[in-house]
Amino acid sequence: MDEPSQGGDQKLSAMEHVKKRHEEKGFLYACLFMLCCCFCCYETCEHCLECFCCCCKKDN
């Protein structure tokens, strides 16, 4: 199997990480991964909230 190197995996955005986990492990795992993405993908919590939380959009 062709597996991406760890170096390439670290360059993924938070959303790309969640999509990858969804494909690999399923929906529930991806949701749990998203909740702790600041630990798993080294993004800040603010970045994750901007990407994933529709409640955080103040324009609406």
Swiss-Prot record:
Transmembrane domains' residue ranges: 26-42
Protein source organism: Oryza sativa subsp. japonica (Rice)
Membrane topology field: Single-pass membrane protein
Family statement drawn from the similarity comment of this UniProt entry: Belongs to the CYSTM1 family.
Cited PANTHER family: CADMIUM TOLERANT 3, PROTEIN CADMIUM TOLERANCE 4
GO cellular component assignments: extracellular region; plant-type cell wall; plasma membrane
Regulation: induction: Down-regulated in root tissues but up-regulated in shoot tissues in response to cadmium (CdCl(2)).
Compartment(s): Cell membrane; Secreted, Cell wall
Tissue specificity note: Mainly expressed in shoots, and, to a lower extent, in roots.
InterPro entries assigned to the protein according to its UniProt record, in alphabetical order: CYSTM1_HM_Tolerance (IPR051671), CYSTM_dom (IPR028144)
One Pfam family recorded for the sequence: CYSTM
Keywords, alphabetical: Cell membrane, Cell wall, Membrane, Metal-binding, Secreted, Stress response, Transmembrane, Transmembrane helix
Reported function: Confers resistance to heavy metal ions (e.g. aluminium (Al)) by chelating them at the plasma membrane of root cells, thus stopping their entry and reducing their accumulation.
Disulfide bond annotation, renumbered to this chain: none
GO molecular function: metal ion binding; metal ion sequestering activity
Domain of life the protein comes from: Eukaryota
Protein name: Protein CADMIUM TOLERANCE 4
Gene Ontology biological process: cellular detoxification; detoxification of aluminum ion; detoxification of cadmium ion; detoxification of copper ion; response to aluminum ion; response to cadmium ion
